[in-house]
Regions:
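Short, charge-patterned binding micro-sites
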Residues: 5, 43-64, 95-96
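C-terminal structural segments of small proteins and small subunits
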Residues: 60-96
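Structural beta->alpha junctions
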Residues: 14-18, 61-64
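A short linear hydrophobic-aromatic micro-motif
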Residues: 40-46, 88-91
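C-terminal binding/interaction regions
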Residues: 23
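Short glycine-/aliphatic-rich beta-strand segments at the starts of folded cytosolic domains
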Residues: 6-14, 20
């Protein structure tokens, strides 16, 4: 049986953020929703001290490449639908 690992890295701008506290509320909400809805690992990984920019990453494991791809694309859709942030860049990698 094969193991498939997927990662998704998303760079965001948070235009309405005036402080790190504002930014962290938006980022924390995104990460919590993704963890709860999709059972993935999630973390803020870059631009930690920049209040209008964030980089978040998500990871999941499955035995089916299609499941991993679908799940990470749904997470990207979730982030893109959030009115408090804008996706600047995204990178999806699948390792099997």
């Amino acid at each position: 049986m094969a193991m498939v690992v997927g990662t998704l890295r998303i760079t965001l701008t948070i235009p309405g953020s005036d402080s790190l506290k504002d930014k962290r509320q938006v980022v924390r909400s995104l990460l919590d929703v993704a963890r709860n809805r999709f059972n993935v690992s999630a973390a803020e990984i870059d631009h930690l001290d920049t209040h209008r920019l964030a980089c978040v990453a998500f990871a999941c494991v499955s035995n089916d490449r299609t499941v991993v791809n679908r799940m990470l694309n749904k997470i990207l859709d979730l982030v893109e639908s959030n009115p408090l942030c804008e996706v600047v860049d995204s990178e999806l990698d699948i390792i099997s």
